[in-house]
Amino acid sequence: MIYKMAHVQLLLLYFFVSTVKAFYLPGVAPTTYRENDNIPLLVNHLTPSMNYQHKDEDGNNVSGDKENFLYSYDYYYNRFHFCQPEKVEKQPESLGSVIFGDRIYNSPFQLNMLQEKECESLCKTVIPGDDAKFINKLIKNGFFQNWLIDGLPAAREVYDGRTKTSFYGAGFNLGFVQVTQGTDIEATPKGAETTDKDVELETRNDRNMVKTYELPYFANHFDIMIEYHDRGEGNYRVVGVIVEPVSIKRSSPGTCETTGSPLMLDEGNDNEVYFTYSVKFNESATSWATRWDKYLHVYDPSIQWFSLINFSLVVVLLSSVVIHSLLRALKSDFARYNELNLDDDFQEDSGWKLNHGDVFRSPSQSLTLSILVGSGVQLFLMVTCSIFFAALGFLSPSSRGSLATVMFILYALFGFVGSYTSMGIYKFFNGPYWKANLILTPLLVPGAILLIIIALNFFLMFVHSSGVIPASTLFFMVFLWFLFSIPLSFAGSLIARKRCHWDEHPTKTNQIARQIPFQPWYLKTIPATLIAGIFPFGSIAVELYFIYTSLWFNKIFYMFGFLFFSFLLLTLTSSLVTILITYHSLCLENWKWQWRGFIIGGAGCALYVFIHSILFTKFKLGGFTTIVLYVGYSSVISLLCCLVTGSIGFISSMLFVRKIYSSIKVD
């Protein structure tokens, strides 16, 4: 019956997944255009940037009073007053795309293959002073527009001084900021006079009353350059898109001279804004199959290689020390214990064998521990498979949100394994409340994450961000969870209860618990946790920086090969360090290894991940909402890391303990 139920659930999941649009693999299903064919231009949300630079009057990069926001805005949010088509149509998106804030719509731009345009009028809008203040604030804080043409992000050309290479960076500026100086007597632009305190920087020459102003210029003209590949016989494919935004102050459409004054929105009056665009086509030798190569830029790979090689050597050294020390010590212990005359010498002996009557004693809160470990195993398998598939190239960045969608599906499927593990561990603890374990394992951790997401959703709603996950999407996720994951989890728990024999211990548990002697300071839980967490954290520290920039600032992350190798190092170090500390604790007659194995394996690394995320905020966070979102999501990431590494530490310790105590003779 259990097998049939699991089989039916898998068939239903296969049916649902098969009805969804297939994942877009590199080199599959290109769109071929003929001359004058329409090329759709889609618009996405406006997102913050990380390394946006202000410029002075000579065009040089200068530092400015820039804040960083961690939420995006809908392109057609009514305060932007962008031109709209006759009928705004939302484009279909994957589940992962919606979760990560994509809001893709059609646009009024008319692009036709090989049909160039010069200063084509788009529309005229009126931007009130209050909305002008809002737009100027986003310009000064480096917000980017994000367009999509034939599945490619409209980009800007970026030069990486470290690698001496150029690449295409997704998105382009909402506007520009010019840093200029003036005195109180000099006439300054209205936008600079009426902006709030953040326009005026702290640099001031009191004697001459010279102030430094940030003048935000709004981009209202777009030079669109489309690169195409000629396939012959009149067939063409889009292989690159660059957009150069220009700010032009004008009183009538049809004039696009860039030598005139730029447009700065007056925050005290209504502003008439004319939007225009130009289109050019450049033939390129780049084939369609390699068009993403220009976007998938690895920032300073030498740092990543250096970090991975160095830490790989550390892991090899650590592994050698741990394995050699344990094998040597255990070999000596086994020989001594198995030759021991229990009647004469047992009371004189010491070491981990003396714990044989307590080492398999059920810990306090065994139900909670089993649920956390099972949830950690579920997350571990999800992360491993997701990174592995991405490293092989199955999850292309051209399929927006595919990674998040696959992670959600895998997490639901691995609910079977997570619940099986949770129930097996609960049997290992001889827990009596198996029904509570069956119900809570698929609900506790996902429910906690859902509540946190809903709470953070309210903060996103407060600032009118496009990152708000719609209620319909949340209900759909919960529906899928109850339809697929929970039945699979129940099946895993029931099978484990009937078929899993982890409750068969190699030694019997005494009725009276053995007193634990005094432990050295470095083996106490908190110091041991802090020491053990250094090694797994070190294996992923470099990759965390790139993951954060991708999550918060809309950068394309495609270094999954580095990430997969780093995750392997994380797994090895978490396992080895926890086993080493568990062994030395047992040698000092501390038989309470269960919670220590989980905490030492997971809490230290999670703590360092959280501290790293806080140190990552060397940039200035803008506003209370941004701080709450950053701390909230960073806490979720750290807690999930704790579950993954904690489950690695616990299972490694459990297998180690069972192995060594099954290898000795106990009467």
Swiss-Prot record:
It comes from the Eukaryota. The keyword Glycoprotein applies. GO terms for cellular component: endosome; endosome membrane; fungal-type vacuole membrane. Residues 23-302, 392-405, 464-474, 549-560, 618-635 are lumenal. The record marks 250-251 as: Cleavage. GO terms for biological process: endosomal transport; intracellular copper ion homeostasis; invasive growth in response to glucose limitation; monoatomic ion transport; protein localization to membrane; pseudohyphal growth; vacuolar transport. It is found in: Endosome membrane; Vacuole membrane. Residues 1-22 form the signal peptide. Belongs to the nonaspanin (TM9SF) (TC 9.A.2) family. With TMN2 and TMN3, plays a critical role in the late stages of a nutrient-controlled pathway notably regulating FLO11 gene expression. Acts downstream of RAS2 and TOR. Essential for cell adhesion and filamentous growth. May play a role as effector of cellular copper homeostasis. This is Transmembrane 9 superfamily member 1. It comes from Saccharomyces cerevisiae (strain ATCC 204508 / S288c). The gene is EMP70.
